[in-house]
């Protein structure tokens, strides 16, 4: 069974991961040496706990974004997704077929689309198609 990690261990590990992400890996022994170099950890036992949690966080980071840790790589990836502009607009189709109710709503909102075509749909036809 696992043990509960203290707030101190978690906070220290998160700060080390944020600042020294490039130096860390998935190996506990290597992370232990890096933690010893970059931080003043008072005891061997505390250092091992911090290194263990660093290794745990690194595994989680590989799977996806981790709450409470902001890495520049993740921030850039998120911004890239937010700024994505599709090559072809969904509105650039030859004809947009809508029913009369939708056309009335667009007119009410003062939205004019050049390729809009109003079609008459019957409830009976709609049921037969599905």
Curated annotation (Swiss-Prot):
Domain of life: Eukaryota
Biological classification of the source: Eukaryota, Sar, Alveolata, Apicomplexa, Aconoidasida
Protein name: Small ribosomal subunit protein eS17
Record-stated family: Belongs to the eukaryotic ribosomal protein eS17 family.
Record field: transmembrane: none
Organism field: Theileria parva (East coast fever infection agent)
NCBIfam families: PRK01151.1
UniProt cross-references to InterPro entries, sorted A to Z: Ribosomal_eS17, Ribosomal_eS17_CS, Ribosomal_eS17_sf
Gene: RPS17
Disulphide bonds in the chain: none
């Amino acid at each position: 069974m696992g043990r509960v990690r203290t707030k101190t261990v978690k906070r220290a590990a998160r700060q080390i991961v944020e600042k020294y992400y490039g130096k860390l890996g998935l190996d506990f022994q290597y992370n232990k040496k890096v933690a010893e170099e970059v931080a003043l950890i008072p005891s061997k036992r505390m250092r091992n706990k911090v290194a263990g949690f660093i290794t745990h966080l690194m595994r989680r980071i590989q799977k996806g974004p981790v709450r409470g840790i902001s890495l520049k790589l993740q921030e850039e990836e998120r911004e890239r997704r937010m700024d994505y502009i599709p090559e072809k607009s969904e509105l650039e189709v030859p004809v947009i077929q809508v029913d009369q109710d939708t056309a009335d709503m667009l007119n009410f909102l003062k939205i004019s689309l050049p390729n809009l075509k109003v079609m008459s749909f019957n409830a009976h036809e709609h049921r037969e198609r599905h």
